[in-house]
């Protein structure tokens, strides 16, 4: 089984997130995608974070595909660092092929994530296009450091069966929605 792991604060989740999830399912040939709502992001201000239960409920509303499973198991782990979460997932699911899925807008700060190189070494990564990030991803520290591990987009369907480090950039339909903009509009 091939499973995409799509983690984030989803504060709030929106149709742009659903588009990334659907694009990953289709282009990577995944059997499932686990939409992992994190209890908190160490790189973001917790003062503006909606309650976890609210973010889970909203995620379930917009993740309409039955192959998308919304989960918040990081809370049960007492964990909010992706590298550690991925280690636990791998240990508990030895027979599953995983791909870490992220929007291209996260790539510019990916090198600031705790143990980001360990994340790259744990599972293959699919970076899905987002507005304003199409060309910028090439200059990101991760793209430069792992340029030799880049898989051609035409071979994205093989990513789950490759050994890490391996990554690809997937072009496709994009949504201009952003959680930051939605929060600003709601408070302003």
UniProtKB/Swiss-Prot annotation:
Q: Which GO terms describe its molecular function?
A: ATP binding; nicotinate-nucleotide adenylyltransferase activity
Matches recorded under SUPFAM superfamilies? Nucleotidylyl transferase (SSF52374)
Gene3D superfamilies in the record: HUPs (3.40.50.620)
**EC number, as in UniProt:** 2.7.7.18
Name the reaction it catalyses: nicotinate beta-D-ribonucleotide + ATP + H(+) = deamido-NAD(+) + diphosphate
- Domain of life, source organism: Bacteria
State the InterPro entries in the record.
Cyt_trans-like, NadD/NMNAT, Rossmann-like_a/b/a_fold
Q: Name one Pfam family in it.
A: CTP_transf_like
Against CDD domains, the record matches this protein to: NMNAT (cd02165)
PANTHER family, per database record: NICOTINATE-NUCLEOTIDE ADENYLYLTRANSFERASE-RELATED (PTHR39321), PHOSPHOPANTETHEINE ADENYLYLTRANSFERASE (PTHR39321:SF3)
Q: What does this protein do?
A: Catalyzes the reversible adenylation of nicotinate mononucleotide (NaMN) to nicotinic acid adenine dinucleotide (NaAD).
State the family named in the UniProt similarity comment for this chain: Belongs to the NadD family.
The protein depicted here goes by the name Probable nicotinate-nucleotide adenylyltransferase
Gene name in the database record: nadD
């Amino acid at each position: 089984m091939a499973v995409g792991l799509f983690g984030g604060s989803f504060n709030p989740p929106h149709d742009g997130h659903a588009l990334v999830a659907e694009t990953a399912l289709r282009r990577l040939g995944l059997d499932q995608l686990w939409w992992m709502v994190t209890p908190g992001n160490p790189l973001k201000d917790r003062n503006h974070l909606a309650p976890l239960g609210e973010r889970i409920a909203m995620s379930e509303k917009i993740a309409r595909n039955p192959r998308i499973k919304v989960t918040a198991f990081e809370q049960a782990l007492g964990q909010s660092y992706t590298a550690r979460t991925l280690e636990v997932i791998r240990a508990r699911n030895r027979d599953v092929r995983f791909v870490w899925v992220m929007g291209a807008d996260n790539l510019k700060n990916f090198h600031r994530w705790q143990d980001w190189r360990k994340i790259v070494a744990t599972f293959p990564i699919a970076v899905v296009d987002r507005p304003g990030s199409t060309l910028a991803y090439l200059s990101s520290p991760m793209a430069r450091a792992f340029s030799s591990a880049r898989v051609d987009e035409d071979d994205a369907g093989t990513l789950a069966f490759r050994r890490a480090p391996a990554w690809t950039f997937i072009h496709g339909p994009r949504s201009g929605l952003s959680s930051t903009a939605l929060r600003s509009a709601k408070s302003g």
